[in-house]
């Protein structure tokens, strides 16, 4: 209950989302004491081990007036962390780690921390890396991993295990998992990879196999839903600053200069939004969530003409599709062409320069920065604790700053688009003074 001077408001009960446990379909699953209780580096004070009563709320800010609806009842998730009893004997664990899809800063850090965490926290020594994504389960021999081997992987970009797109053959993958004797699967990838993880989880459950599956969501453009952010995003925003700085220098160094930067973003504009707020050098931020037009009152050309008259230069930023999928227009190349045609048509005798920068691969191929490295460690350890506790078919990630376990099928379906009604988009427009692109 929430009390005020004039009334009493009833806060609704919360609905705890179910995370599948091995005991749901293997009732005879045995438990073991958590070795962390005997680890000299940990002080297992009261509350150190979590239970089913520890939850994380999906929404920690509710509009009780009903103006902005929230799910009824509001959702809650199981809190991530170690449990007092575990459902795997560490000496019997055979863990597999796989990376799928495109590159993202922090992939190697997650691999490293999974290996070190399993080894040092739980005494698991049979840890294997799967090469080249999902197809690696049935096409390549697993690579034995240990802490010494992965010691400096967090300093490298990309993924040492290598990755690929496609190659998802459910029966071949699950058969290979059985044949190799894996009983823990750590799957690192984006939304497509998580959809594959759902199928693997369902097939393992159908076969009633004692195997836990956890997804660690990866997408550099931060389009994974439910969780606060995906790993690598902070690094991507930081690297985007270099491209913006270069575009700004090029623009101010020319007469009527325009710097055009195309950033990654598969139908979401999070990198562009945050990079704009961080740099303060961007005059117009174009994101997929907002339609814009070129000609006429309130259009992009009118805005740029005014900005060039006032400042003598402008910096534009747009987002593109990460996957390179041909159904997505290459907005950067198209916009560069349209800008050149506009200027030559309307100002044929005036100087004009446009410098186009596409830092896509620079952004996604670099090592994780300090913030993302720390984040990747927490994600990896949260995944390990959940799997050792017997949970399966889940994703780990922060919700409102608290780490939680989320059903993998929910994450596979959820999207995280920029909410243009949110105050952050208003901040972008206040920084850039750009039009709202509403036709008059």
Predicted segments with their positions:
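N-terminal low-complexity/intrinsically disordered extensions
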Residues: 1-98, 109, 120-126, 132-135, ...
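Short glycine-rich or small-residue beta-strand-to-loop segments that form or flank ligand, phosphate
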Residues: 94-104, 159-162, 183-189, 215, ...
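Short, ordered loop/turn segments at secondary-structure junctions
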Residues: 100-102, 129-135, 165-166, 190-193, ...
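Short glycine/serine/threonine-rich phosphate/pyrophosphate-binding segments
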Residues: 104-114, 137-138, 168-173, 191-199, ...
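Accessory alpha-helical/coil subdomains and C-terminal extensions
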Residues: 176, 187-189, 195-204, 208-210, ...
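A glycine-rich phosphate-binding loop feature that marks nucleotide/adenosyl-phosphate handling sites
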Residues: 260-267, 358-361, 397-404, 409
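Active-site pocket-lining segment
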Residues: 347-365
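Internal hydrophobic alpha-helix adjacent to the cofactor/substrate pocket in enzyme cavities
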Residues: 378-392
């Amino acid at each position: 209950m929430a009390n005020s001077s004039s009334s009493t408001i009833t806060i609704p009960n919360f609905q705890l989302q179910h995370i599948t446990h091995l005991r749901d379909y293997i009732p005879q699953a045995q438990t073991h004491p958590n070795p962390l209780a005997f680890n000299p580096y940990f002080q297992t004070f009261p509350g150190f081990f979590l239970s089913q009563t520890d939850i994380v709320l999906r929404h920690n800010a509710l509009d009780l007036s009903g103006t902005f609806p929230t799910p009824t009842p509001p959702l809650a998730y199981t809190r991530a962390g170690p449990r007092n009893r575990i459902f795997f004997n560490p000496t019997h664990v055979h863990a597999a780690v796989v990376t799928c899809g495109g590159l993202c800063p922090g992939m190697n850090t997650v691999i490293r921390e999974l290996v070190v965490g399993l080894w040092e926290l739980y005494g698991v020594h049979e840890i294997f890396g799967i090469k080249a994504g999902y197809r690696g389960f049935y096409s390549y021999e697993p690579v034995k991993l240990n802490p010494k081997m992965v010691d400096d992987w967090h300093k490298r970009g990309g993924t040492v295990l290598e990755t690929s797109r496609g190659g998802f053959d459910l029966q071949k993958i699950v058969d290979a998992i059985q044949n190799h004797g894996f009983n823990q699967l750590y799957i690192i990838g984006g939304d497509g990879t998580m959809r594959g993880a759902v199928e693997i989880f369902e097939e393992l459950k159908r076969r009633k196999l004692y195997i836990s599956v956890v997804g660690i969501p990866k997408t550099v453009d931060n389009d994974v839903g439910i969780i606060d952010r995906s790993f690598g995003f902070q690094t991507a925003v930081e690297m985007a600053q270099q491209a913006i700085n270069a575009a700004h220098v090029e623009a101010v160094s020319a007469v009527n200069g325009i710097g055009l930067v195309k950033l990654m973003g598969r139908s979401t504009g999070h990198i562009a939004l945050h990079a704009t707020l961080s740099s303060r050098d961007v005059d117009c931020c174009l994101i997929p969530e907002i339609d814009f037009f070129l000609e006429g009152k309130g259009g992009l050309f009118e805005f740029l003409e005014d900005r060039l008259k006032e400042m003598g230069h402008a910096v534009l930023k747009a987002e593109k599709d990460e996957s390179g999928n041909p159904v997505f227009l290459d907005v950067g190349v198209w916009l560069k062409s349209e800008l050149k045609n506009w200027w030559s048509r309307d100002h044929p005798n005036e100087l004009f320069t446009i410098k186009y920068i596409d830092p896509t691969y620079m952004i996604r191929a670099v090592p994780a920065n300090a913030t993302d490295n720390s984040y990747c460690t927490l994600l990896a350890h949260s995944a390990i604790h959940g799997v050792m506790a017997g949970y399966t078919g889940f994703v780990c990630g922060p919700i409102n700053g608290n780490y939680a376990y989320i059903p993998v099928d929910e994450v596979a379906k959820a999207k995280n688009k920029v909410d243009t009604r949110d105050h952050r988009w208003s901040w972008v427009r206040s920084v850039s003074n750009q039009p709202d692109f509403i036709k008059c």
